[in-house]
Every structure is written in structure tokens, then in C-alpha cells.
Amino acid sequence: MPVLHNRISNEELKARMLAETEPRTTVSFYKYFTIDDPKAFRDRLYIQLEQCKVLGRIYIATEGINAQISVPNNQFDAFKAVLFSAHPALDQIRLNIALEDDGKSFWVLRMKVRERIVADGIDDPTFNPANVGQYLKADQVNAMADDPDTVFVDMRNHYEYEVGHFENALEVPSDTFREQLPMAVEMLDEARDKNIVMYCTGGIRCEKASAYMLHHGFKNVYHVEGGIIEYARQAKAQGLPLKFIGKNFVFDERMGERISDDVIAHCHQCGASCDSHTNCRNEGCHLLFIQCPTCAAKYEGCCSTQCLDEMKLPLEEQRAIRSGRENGMKIFNKSKGLLQSTLHIPAPEVKDKAE
């Protein structure tokens, strides 16, 4: 029986990926549909995708599939054939192709079965995730962006919104999607007579959010088809003005795709104009934060002098310091509270309600 998971170290896998000469394409896709046996579906698809040399992260649940992957260009047609034939619901599924891509976004294939493909915290048997808002293409998005009776709602996390968003979009300030959903209902309560446009990176969160808003009695609910990635692709292909400003945060090694030339964020250490995310180099921290080149050199990639000092200690001393706090300091830590307390960044002023 084939091995259905990776057994090679991350270091070796990353070295192999960097040594590849065949160009790769970074792709994301999702689909809400019923999978009766997620584990069997996962195992079957894993074998086929591994043969196509696919790398990346795929979540599978009874409610569907969510994937961010990279595919060798010479295997792309084979990959599409595998995916489109994996289930009738996946035939001709839309693939979001990365806008900025060197093909080095992933170095291992990880496929996991989860309870949900996006953690929403919804525990209401009357909720119908199939009853979603209306899709909007790029030209429709632009028209609604200029409409004073329309509210754009960003259904991404604080660190995503910080580096890029649609003009005048409402931020729902939270670390998690499950917290955002009820917050969005409360914040938009006085805007029930307006058009509500939900958006996210690739469409998976805003599609479910649109269903959640309809479930809570909102009538004119829309969501951006394919999220920011597809909007930017359509807008650029059609020569439309970009209503999204800044950078689109992505969950791979790139950490962002440039959408417009605007840099709307600032270095979390010195305040210089910057929108480049990084993880603190201290193995006991890995805080996600924005760091300019000057501060990267000054702090050697760390988020603070404390982490810099700790990183220079002998390994045994580092491990002793980290002991007992590992569970709270996982790699790719994205907590807004931790960011504010570590770097002494004040919480931004956020509107309580949509105007």
C-alpha cells in the first residue's frame, strides 16, 4: 500500500523544491459540495496528485474542498484532468491562478480531513450554506464600489486587511473567521437596506459569509466571485481601474501579491512605509508582523530586542526559556493581541457600525 503522507524532513523538501528547474504555477481553488467519505476521497486524491508532483495544502471535509497548491507546468494538464474527474462537482471548477508567482510557494503536499473546510463555528441546523449571495464580476464590483448605497465588507483577518483592501471597506476586527460572522451581523445591522458586498482572498470565506448574512435576514447580499485574486485578474485583463488598493496577503511563502502600487501599511517597529510580512526568526516566537529592510537588518529578522537576545543564546538555554510556552507560540502566530502587546502597537480605531 502506498504511503499517503510525507516522511521527509521539511529542510530536505524545501531544498528539493528550490533546486527544481521545471517552472511551477501557484493555484488555489475551493468548492462547497457533499463528500460522503472524506477520508477515502482524500486518500484517492492524494495518490493522484502526488503523481502529478503537486505541492501545497488541501483541506477536505463533508462540506467540500479547499486548496492552495503549486503544480509543475509540465504536469498542469494532468493535474486538471485528475481534479476535474475526482467528483462531478469539481468538473471545470474555477482555478485561481496566482498573480505574482515564482512557483516556490510550497515544498510539501499536505492533505488533511477536517470538520469544515473553513472554521466557521456555525452550529445552527437551520443554516443553509447553499443559499449564498449573488456573485459579482470585476466590472460589477467597480460599479458597486462607486455606489453610496453599498457597503463592502472585508471577511479576512486583521493582518490581511492591514496591507490591502477595497477602498472604504469595512474591517471586521478579529483573529478568526468564526468570530467575524456574528460581529459582521451586529456591525451591519443599521445597513440592512443597503447592498452588502462581502469579499475575501479567493472566495471561500465571503461565499459562506454571504449565506450567513442572508440567514440573518439581510436581503441585498453579494460576494466577489473568486475573491480578490479573480477580481484583480479580471480587472487587469479588461483594463478596469483597480478598486482594491495595496497588497493581497496569501498563505504561502510569498505572504503577499502586489495588486496596486499603493503601500498602505507601516513597519511595526519604526513606522516606515512598508507592507512586507515576515515571521520572527526566534524559534520560540514566530510572530507574524510587518518589518522594513532597515529593521530587518537591525533586529536580524526578530520582532524585538528580547527575541534577538534570546535567539543568540545557546540552544539549551533557548529551549529552557521556551519550555511551557510552546502551545501559545506556534509557528505563524497571527494573534492581534500578541502583536500589540509585543510591539506596543495601539489597537486601531474601528467603526462600531456601518454607516
Curated annotation (Swiss-Prot):
PANTHER family referenced in this protein's UniProt entry, alphabetically: TRNA URIDINE(34) HYDROXYLASE, UPF0176 PROTEIN YCEA
Catalysed reaction equations from the record: uridine(34) in tRNA + AH2 + O2 = 5-hydroxyuridine(34) in tRNA + A + H2O
GO biological process: tRNA modification
Organism of this sequence: Pectobacterium carotovorum subsp. carotovorum (strain PC1)
Alphabetized InterPro entries for the sequence: Rhodanese-like_dom, Rhodanese-like_dom_sf, Rhodanese_C, TrhO, TRHO_N
Family indicated by similarity: Belongs to the TrhO family.
Record keywords: Oxidoreductase, tRNA processing
EC number(s) on file: 1.14.-.-
Rhodanese domain boundaries: 146-240
Pfam families found in the cross-reference section: Rhodanese (PF00581), Rhodanese_C (PF12368), UPF0176_N (PF17773)
Biological role: Catalyzes oxygen-dependent 5-hydroxyuridine (ho5U) modification at position 34 in tRNAs.
Residue numbers annotated as active site: 200
Top-level EC class as recorded in UniProt: oxidoreductase
Descriptive protein name: tRNA uridine(34) hydroxylase
Molecular function in Gene Ontology: oxidoreductase activity, acting on paired donors, with incorporation or reduction of molecular oxygen
